[in-house]
Amino acid sequence: MSQSPTASDSLLGIKPYRFVVDNDWYRGEAGIASFEPEELFGTKLRALLQRRKNRDLFDLHQGLEQLALDADKLIACFGHYLALEGNPITRAMAEQRMLEKLGRSLTEDVVPLLPADIRFDDAVALAAFGRVWKELIARIPGEGWKLAGSVVDALRQRGYPDLLKGAA
């Protein structure tokens, strides 16, 4: 099982951030130390590819939507933590694992955890899948999975007609 990064494992170092709380109950601020977003999301990508749960897909999608993530730095951090574990994931393995996720629901382990005003239905999940594939999976070094094309074609015929259209 994957473990969270520690400060000594960090590739990019620990960075200070200002944290502000301003609401009806409390107002205050503090300095906190944390990893850079690319490092945190690099471990999210690792988790997405190492476990069956898809909640990391939601998190990666949100990170790509809300933050100006440097995808190359994120992939470097992904590789760094895999190397620390001694458990590499090649691009071919990543593509295979991602496509296998489409054999089950992308949303069932996520939706119960979300606030009512956050929408993550099948259409949004499939768009998130495509974005993570195009912006992250396609950047993992190495050759792609040799069966990816035929698996994508089969999935398109089985209900995902726009799956990875225009993907690298």
Q: What annotation goes with each model-predicted range?
A:
Residues 1-168:
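Structured mid-to-C-terminal alpha-helical surface segments
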